[in-house]
Amino acid sequence: MWKWKVILLFLAEMFVSGVNGDCACYEANNVTGKSAPISNSYMTEDFSPCYLPCSYVAYSGDETYGWTGLVLNWKTTTNSGGIIQIFDGPSATGTPIIQVAEGETIAAGIGKSLIKSSLPVITIKYSQTGSGASMFILNINNGTFVTNVYYGSISTAAGLAPIAVSTTTTAMPTTRSYSNPNFAYDPYFITHDIFVVINQRTSGGMAALTSLNALAINFVTLLSTTTDINSVSSSRLSLATLTPYDPYYSVQGGIWELSATDVLNNVPRSGVTIEGDIDSALIGLADLAFTVNKNASTDTRNNVQRSVVLLTAEWPSNALLGDNVASKFTELGLNLLVVGYNLTDAETSQLLRTDRWYNAINSSDSKITNVAAFVNPFYFNNGANNFWCPPFGITNSVDGTYSWFQEPYNYTGPHGINGVWTDPFDGQTGRYCNFANNQYVYQNNAGGSVKVQVYFELEAGKDFLNFYDASNNLIASFTGYEIAGSSFFTSTTTLTARFTSDNKSIFRGFWVSITPQP
């Protein structure tokens, strides 16, 4: 707590004093408490509104309490480019976790009101970017001064992990030490609900089954695991084996209750000789463990990726993975990875068919390098052929008046000029992927100005859609959630959009249109 008090005292000297002539900031000093008010500047003699760029720091007073529940209403707007920004931490730097444009109402319990800070300290800032007024605007009709008039507040809520008091001057590391040249990133940070499925039927006997088990074990022991349905990091695990009879699978242990050690102790130790039904088993497991908001112990998490990893040392001719399986997985926002082991050429050709909707790989061994061969391209999204996150290039509209692109490929949010996010996000399907690093390039061949409209729902402060001009200067950045979308204009000859996401929460993504202006 003392470190925040020191910061607040320091910032009290740094930030605007709150007075410019007779115009004063509504909150001229930094605040400590459970609620922080947000309102326009005022004239000291009569409290009439005026404009002053204002900023202050709010501290919850408790390391375990962050900030959320923003509500904001506008009584008067002046088209002067007013903007309210809330930053995570004790300075107005970096990307704000919440940004509210002039005239945008924030209602309690939805949209931006739900965004939470990750620290007990936030910075609240108001500024104007337009030419409406430097101090205020004169209303010629009645001779009074008017400017943007707004009022709101943001409150604290429990939920932050307490910050441990350090006994040394060495800063606590934010990431764990890890170095393995086989992996693009540390597998410990993979955040998925993962159902490992092992096919007990194999013509390779115990040697092949043992290798399948080793692949599964070498994979899950790399992960950080949890059983908490409310967590937004780490992976939850389940395990099943394929069997010859309906429902063609056998769940080993509790669904979403396993650790890596549990998987190690429950992999199959013997095989079966009768062929099962892989398609039916996958559909059944999908329905069993990958629905949201049913208030059941088998519920999947709303804001994480989901995957079934099927390990098999044979690929039977009756395993089609056809439209019925594909539609079920799409309906549930679920991904499939098939890891074959020493499959024949004919089996490999059938599994890796060109029209597949799932990820697949044929492994010749069960070493860490073989695990990396499917973790890197699919879990780390670090490859050109990831069917979980297929690329969606810039596309021309049917009438040729604009170009557009989106992510994910099955984006379900608003489109067009007047689109609005209306449906609450249940987290079942239509979500982007972790570890994204995707680029979209638009060539402004006609020259002149273009209007870029963006609808976005991203993890606030962690996942970003950034736009750059031809000189690679950042000209717009989007994160968090915008109910009615945002837009900007640019005349750059080359417009580059880059989308990046971290390893944690995922949401409904974005839709972008680029329209040449007359």
Swiss-Prot record:
Glycans are attached at residues 30, 142, 295, 342, 362, 410, 503. Transmembrane segments: none annotated. This is Uncharacterized protein E02H4.4. It is found in: Secreted. InterPro entries: Sperma_CUB_dom_sf. Keywords: Glycoprotein, Secreted, Signal. GO terms for cellular component: extracellular region. Residues 389-517 form the CUB domain. Residues 1-21 form the signal peptide.
